[in-house]
Amino acid sequence: MATSHPDPTTSRHVAVIGAGAAGLVAARELRREGHSVVVLERGSQIGGVWAYTSQVEPDPLSLDPTRPVVHSSLYRSLRTNIPRECMGFTDFPFATRPHDGSRDPRRHPAHTEVLAYLRDFAKEFDIEEMVRFETEVVKAEQVAAEGEERGKWRVESRSSDGVVDEIYDAVVVCNGHYTEPRHALITGIDSWPGKQIHSHNYRVPDQFKDQVVIVIGSSASGVDICRDIAQVAKEVHVSSRSTSPDTYEKLTGYENLWLHSTIQIAREDGSVVFENGKTIYADTIMHCTGYKYYFPFLDTKGEVTVDDNRVGPLYKHVFPPALAPSLSFIGLPWQITPFPMFELQSKWVAAVLSGRVSLPSQDEMMEDTKAFYDKLEASGIPKRYTHLMPDDSQFEYDNWLADQCEYPRIEKWREQMFYIGFKRIYAQSSTYRDNWDDDHLIVEAYDDFVKFMSSYQELLPMLKT
């Protein structure tokens, strides 16, 4: 079965759902390709997850489906775990701004600097004029037009002006995946009397003063939050499934922070028993256990499902074969350098919608996707890691996207900087943000940046000394 494509250089009316980093660059690329774009954003500002709020949800575990949802999961102390040079969009560098004293010049800046960068990006490319703020998408579904095998998309949205139904040629989903928490499954937890919270609702450590806290998870948020809490807590115990069962060690530089293996059982007397045999009486368990992909507004009649955190079937993590090219997803992969990938995915989607780039047939896309899933299964990789891109896979994917669009491949300095930085996180988790040994790559980055912003020319002599 052949996949239907727009005529070459066709302009489409496109709804972009979300005005975070993915939605902003999707809007830019779609408009660059000649499409008419409306960005629907439920919040009052751009930035998505990077728009910090001190507000948290009333349900600390975010289990109640009727709860008022807070989109952002940022904690106040968060700094980027990726160097700013490799984090930015390819043609809009995320470089320091030496003449603006209000900005954070650090190489791993605070979340406020990332939001400021996204605002700069939106201003530079006049993106906000395409955004409808405080507009929540209630439903998006395909509707058949008379005489057409495949229809357009009806998007129902709600704002202070009421509910609106609109018809679009295509929908690009950019609503992020850091809002709907995943939780650890702990034997006996229903009878355990202590408090539980997911990191989605963590902002500051004050509430944990003098407590014994167990932090489940040792990825980015777990590493940061356990150290944040250790400043005020009596004890902090980190449970990590990536350690051996007998693990029990005090973390360097802390007198009240220990690393354990997984939890064996939680008991009604308030104790928690680890696989290493240690028993801890804890006040609070903090779940730093990641998030679920969640699209409550999207009705695809079963063509796209979320199964154990696999969104699929999706060709190259973007297009559902049965609904391509009118439905696409930007930003699903993780453990990546996100903004450049969002940009390349957006270029691909925009070019496919205009007809400048063609997709394989529906059958060929399904065959490719099934082969990818079969490869994961044969390697023993669980479904929940479908969109994880470890090792070289993210840059192979980025370069594949670039080739589709006849756009330059990812710079070698950017790849090397990511790899070195990623290794540094685990080798020196407490200090990696302020100690590094890849200055030569910083110089290469700024050599590239001057092609886009001549104001960085003055920084080069300082960087090279």
Curated annotation (Swiss-Prot):
Its EC number is 1.8.-.-. FAD binds at G18, A19, G20, A21, A22, G23. The lineage of its organism: Eukaryota, Viridiplantae, Streptophyta, Embryophyta, Tracheophyta. Keywords: FAD, Flavoprotein, Monooxygenase, NADP, Oxidoreductase. It comes from the Eukaryota. One of its GO terms (molecular function) is NADP binding. This is Flavin-containing monooxygenase FMO GS-OX-like 2. SUPFAM superfamilies: FAD/NAD(P)-binding domain. PANTHER family: DIMETHYLANILINE MONOOXYGENASE. NADP(+) binds at G217, S218, S219, A220, S221, G222. GO terms for biological process: defense response to fungus. Its cofactor is FAD. Catalyzes the conversion of methylthioalkyl glucosinolates of any chain length into methylsulfinylalkyl glucosinolates. Disulfide bonds: none annotated. Belongs to the FMO family. Pfam families: FMO-like. Gene3D superfamilies: FAD/NAD(P)-binding domain (3.50.50.60).
